[in-house]
């Protein structure tokens, strides 16, 4: 992976830059917990939530699209990992996201890896995590989803329980799909986190086929698979072909990288193992996206995630073939107005380019170059 690109200009607001400096004085997982609790508290009350939605939510009709039968008011969603248990279901629409992906959740509850397990790489505007799928379990999330009606689409990202042997992974994913499929706007099968031993081995087509087939058999909800940026090009092609063959709704590309190439933050090696998100994964995420679109075209929905910080980055992904986008690290570094800024920038570029809808822009640069 390459190092971080130059810092984006014009992104964020000065007040958040000051707040971020204060936040970054606190250990990463602790401040995440505190800020997340604050966001939930503010958006739990009707009138603040309605006010925030009025100010931040994507309402421009040019941003709306219907993807695998689900209407998304805007293409930028919150990536999996921020809200692992669906505790903030009403927060994300109020903060300007067009949808949110909850998880990763496993069939049974598990504590994840020992702390410390989340670190900032400020010189790279990146994060390093080895959380290990800490979550309350699929059953708890199912109860929460059944009780609430969020105002934006909610996807659910499912992973393998750490204690489950690889030869029992099919049953593990099947159990989560059975519980959560009827309650989610879409399901993502996560076989690409580097933080569960042996999980990435399940990306091999021979191992992946029975998992995806089992999940598809359990639910009529759209099913996607999330892949790693560290796959070889031939492995990306094989998974794309498998997804088309099985009738998946799409592919989420990409997860975090284990590569340390080109990082600028000092002392990264001392932080230990984990996946890196943010700008260091951006170049490979774009490469994988372009390869996937060239391989499958419009036969699959492509969701691009990894290193999106600005509207220019978002626009590059859309025109390269992404119907939807996701961000997590960009939100951490960009602040509460980040999603609105991205959506506003996309809307402006759609109009400047003469596109009548978001759908018209998806893959446009790939078609021109082809």
Swiss-Prot record:
Monomer. PROSITE patterns: DHODEHASE_1, DHODEHASE_2. Its EC number is 1.3.5.2. InterPro entries: Aldolase_TIM, DHO_dehydrogenase, Dihydroorotate_DH_2, Dihydroorotate_DH_cat, Dihydroorotate_DH_CS. It catalyses: (S)-dihydroorotate + a quinone = orotate + a quinol. This is Dihydroorotate dehydrogenase (quinone). Belongs to the dihydroorotate dehydrogenase family. Type 2 subfamily. The active site is at 193 (nucleophile). FMN binds at residues 80-84, 104, 157, 190, 226, 254, 278, 307, 328-329. Its cofactor is FMN. It is a peripheral membrane protein. GO terms for molecular function: dihydroorotate dehydrogenase (quinone) activity. GO terms for cellular component: cytoplasm; plasma membrane. Binds 1 FMN per subunit. Pathway: Pyrimidine metabolism; UMP biosynthesis via de novo pathway; orotate from (S)-dihydroorotate (quinone route): step 1/1. It is found in: Cell membrane. Substrate binds at residues 84, 129-133, 190, 195, 255-256. It comes from Mycolicibacterium paratuberculosis (strain ATCC BAA-968 / K-10). Signal peptide: none annotated. Catalyzes the conversion of dihydroorotate to orotate with quinone as electron acceptor. It is an enzyme of class 1 (oxidoreductase). Keywords: Cell membrane, Flavoprotein, FMN, Membrane, Oxidoreductase, Pyrimidine biosynthesis.
């Amino acid at each position: 992976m390459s190092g971080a690109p130059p810092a984006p200009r014009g992104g964020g607001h000065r007040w958040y830059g000051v707040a971020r400096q204060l936040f970054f004085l606190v250990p990463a997982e602790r401040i995440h917990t505190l800020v997340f609790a604050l966001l939930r508290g503010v958006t739990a009350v009707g009138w603040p939530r309605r006010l925030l939605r009025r100010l931040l939510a994507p309402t421009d009709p040019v941003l709306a699209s219907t993807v695998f039968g689900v209407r998304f008011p805007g293409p930028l969603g919150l990536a999996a990992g921020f809200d692992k248990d669906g505790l903030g279901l009403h927060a994300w629409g109020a903060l300007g996201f067009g949808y949110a992906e909850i998880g990763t959740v496993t069939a049974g509850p598990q504590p994840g890896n020992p702390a410390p397990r989340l670190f900032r790489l400020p010189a790279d505007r990146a994060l390093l995590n080895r959380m290990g799928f800490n979550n309350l379990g699929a059953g708890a999330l199912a109860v929460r989803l059944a009780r609430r009606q969020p105002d934006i689409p909610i996807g659910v990202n499912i992973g393998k329980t750490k204690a489950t042997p690889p030869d029992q992974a099919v049953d593990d994913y099947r159990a989560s799909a059975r519980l959560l499929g009827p309650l989610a706007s879409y399901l993502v099968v996560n076989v690409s986190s580097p933080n569960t031993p042996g999980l990435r081995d399940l990306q091999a087509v021979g191992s992946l086929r029975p998992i995806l087939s089992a999940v598809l058999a359990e639910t009529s909800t759209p099913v996607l698979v999330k892949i790693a940026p560290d796959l070889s090009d031939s492995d990306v092609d094989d998974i794309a072909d498998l997804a088309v063959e099985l009738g998946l709704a799409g592919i989420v590309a990409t997860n975090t990288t284990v590569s340390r190439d080109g990082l600028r933050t000092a002392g990264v090696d001392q932080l230990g193992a984990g996946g890196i998100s943010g700008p260091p994964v951006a170049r490979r995420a774009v490469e994988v996206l372009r390869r996937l679109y060239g391989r499958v075209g419009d036969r699959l929905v492509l969701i691009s995630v990894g290193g999106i910080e600005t509207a220019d980055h978002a626009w590059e992904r859309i025109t390269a073939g992404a119907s939807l986008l996701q961000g997590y690290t960009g939100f951490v570094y960009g602040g509460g107005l980040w999603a609105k800024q991205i959506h506003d920038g996309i809307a402006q570029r759609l109009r400047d380019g003469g596109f009548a809808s978001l759908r018209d822009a998806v893959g446009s640069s790939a078609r021109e170059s082809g």
